[in-house]
Amino acid sequence: MLEKQIIHSFVSIVGEDNVDTSNMGRLTYSYDATPNFQAMPDAVIAPRNTNEVAEVLKICNTHKIPVYVRGSGTNLCAGTCPLEGGIVLIFRHMNNILEIDEENLTITVQAGVITLDIIKAVEEKSLFYPPDPSSMKISTIGGNINENSGGLRGLKYGVTRDYVMGLELVLPNGDIIRTGGKLAKDVAGYDLTRLFIGSEGTLGVVTEAILKLVPMPETKKTMLALYEDINEAARAVSSIIANKIIPATLEFLDQPTIEVVEEFAQIGLPTDVKAILLIEQDGPPEVVNRDIEKMANVCRSMNAVDVRIAKDEAEADALRTARRSALSALARLKPTTILEDATVPRSQIAPMVEAINAIAKKYNIPICTFGHAGDGNLHPTCMTDARNEEEMHRAEQAFAEIFAKAIELDGTITGEHGVGAMKAPYLEMKLGKEGIAAMQGIKQAFDPNNIMNPGKMFAKDTRKRVVVER
């Protein structure tokens, strides 16, 4: 627990109403969306501005108090779980859109702004912020930046880092710096902006961001391709890209996922096929119509049993909603849902899907697979019960093999969820000892007292695991 004098110091900075040391308050921020990770912080602090963040960090750095920066807690790698106590920083007061600059096509926001609020705000001005993580109704832009979040539109439009032009940051020692700006070109010094994107709160605190916008696409169309053979569906993904078409969305759902999603969303998805590709294209009408026709022909040539084009925006929106509800639908089946994001080059989608199915059979565990097939980002999802230790051990072994297979296929252990505590034991598989050492050097340079999100990225326990006991 924190000393009373330190608590009083925090209160003097942010006000009594913004320091919570109650059991209920601390319990609320002791876990995130990751199953079976939980640890109590000593206090929850809600700063009102960047200067207050800086003053809080100065105290924490002096007394070596762990700091866990938290958005809405939607991350799936135990990235915000306060494993070593200390304080959780929340941004309920720092949640304002500061400026929409139509001349420079930028939006400036505080870290606590909800992602969907950004998307809606710029849509009113016929502008477009493309990153669309499935959690966008809840997640904050600060969380998106720290995790470098992706989304359904990542294939065509990229991920969060492709839209962050500048940041306001507070370093662990309390220094406030600004990186980047409203510039199309800027090569002055190291690219600190990109260094902090995806750093998972281990290097400092993001308080503001300047984000790039693009013009709103003129139109869009959505289609479904249905397959009796899951491998043919996977091969169709590579074939579409090989035909020089980059759709806005190219999603994959296997049969178990389809059945659960249809029961949940009830939009008329066919449940008697082995796989579905959900494909969307946007842009000028002539380009959209041409590409949809081409992709339909490609899917048919890859033995799709049917290709269906949404008749109107309402039907298209229902299909998008169904895909975004996959995790919610699957999570209803059993008490514990392990959602992973092994990612491979899109040319390796078919062998990766085959491997996931073989591994699930080998360990006798249910794994449903869906995800952003167009960029190789698959979500093998296991429905289990953490109270069943024997089954959990099998799940642990299965995911270890899935990660190893992704690496074997020139992929990665995580495409968008991040490393956090859950994936830390696997990071060396991807980077090697030398890569880990390079990252530790960066960490030491910015945060020599290791106050920022300790217990994440760098594994203290070499045991491979997907969950830990409370």
Regions found by a protein language model. Give the residues of each.
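Noncatalytic alpha-helical scaffold of FAD-dependent oxidoreductases
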Residues: 1-470
